[in-house]
Amino acid sequence: VSGSLSATKPSGLTRKQQALLDREQELIAIAFEVVKREGFTGLTMDKVAAASSYSKGTVYNHFTSKEDLIAALATKALSQEIAMFKRASAFKGNNREKLLAVHVAYALFCCLEPALSNCVLSCRTPAVTEKSSEKRLAAMNSLEAELLSLGDQIMELGAARGEVDMSGSIPATSIVFANWAMGFGANALFNSASESGAVVRVQETCENPILDCINLLLDGVGWKPLSTEFNYQETWQRVLDEIFPEEAAFIRQSKSL
């Protein structure tokens, strides 16, 4: 489950184009392993070349810089997120449950791929974007737009069915952004700052702190059914059991080692 960087290959490629694509995917996979071991600061073009059967010049033929390589990793991360979010949005339940399923998917992704989940934000810093190729930035923008559209669709369905009232002063874009911000921040803290006093305290007193954060947010905008009227912990477990059983089992096994 973890570490998969496979990509859907476009059809109709020539043999040479396919070979170039395969080589690029191989180099991205090598870069991913370097990042997992040493973090983004440890990633260099020299290390990628040394771990491959290609010269540094060949690596530069595919990526204009280390930052361009980080952007390529980010497109892989976004592609994996989208695949998991699409599976989650097919969950059979009301639209708040579907949104919760997306949050479950993101929590799983962050546990399975901590390096890639951090890459999505790192790739948007000026230090990276200023040295990334236009092709790579365009790919990231396209994937981000696809991610946002998934959130927008759930919002629209919730409003159409009267589950959430969008006639107030808070626009749907703000609610979608708040969900992303809360999900990213909470998962980053639990995965990267687990020794923090605030994290330790909330884990000792709450069964599912991330779910509590989601409920605070969605109850705050009045998304029905409210958490006082519905068992969303049960929904969380159903998502794990019905949509992501393999990923959930992998994480449980990893934590028990």
Model-flagged regions — what are they?
Residues 52-63:
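Short hydrophobic/aromatic patch on the recognition helix
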Residues 115-150, 163-174, 199-203:
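Short secondary-structure transition hinges
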